[in-house]
């Protein structure tokens, strides 16, 4: 015979891993081709000159240069090539 009553399992104890979203490179910083600038869900930041957008809306640099952020009705991120 059991000496303890049966205990129900807890329904807690689950959590999802963080996705590490956000801006990875600030304005004025140097970047190389292929560098990830922003990881996002949706288009909170939009690609401008010399910036590509991946299928998961990640923004990345298409050329070596310096990051520029511009805010009008939307926030745009571009990369200005460095002058030699």
Curated annotation (Swiss-Prot):
An example of a Gene Ontology cellular component annotation for this protein is: cytosolic large ribosomal subunit
Instruction: Write down what this protein is called.
Output: Large ribosomal subunit protein bL27
The record's comment on protein family reads: Belongs to the bacterial ribosomal protein bL27 family.
**Gene behind the chain:** rpmA
State the superkingdom.
Bacteria
Could you confirm whether the keyword Oxidoreductase appears in this record? no
Provide the residue span(s) of the region labelled Disordered: 1-27
- Provide any one GO MF term from the record: structural constituent of ribosome
User: What UniProt keywords apply to this chain's record, in alphabetical order?
Assistant: Ribonucleoprotein, Ribosomal protein
List the source organism. Answer: Chlamydia pneumoniae (Chlamydophila pneumoniae)
GO process terms (BP) = translation
Q: Which residues form a coiled coil?
A: none
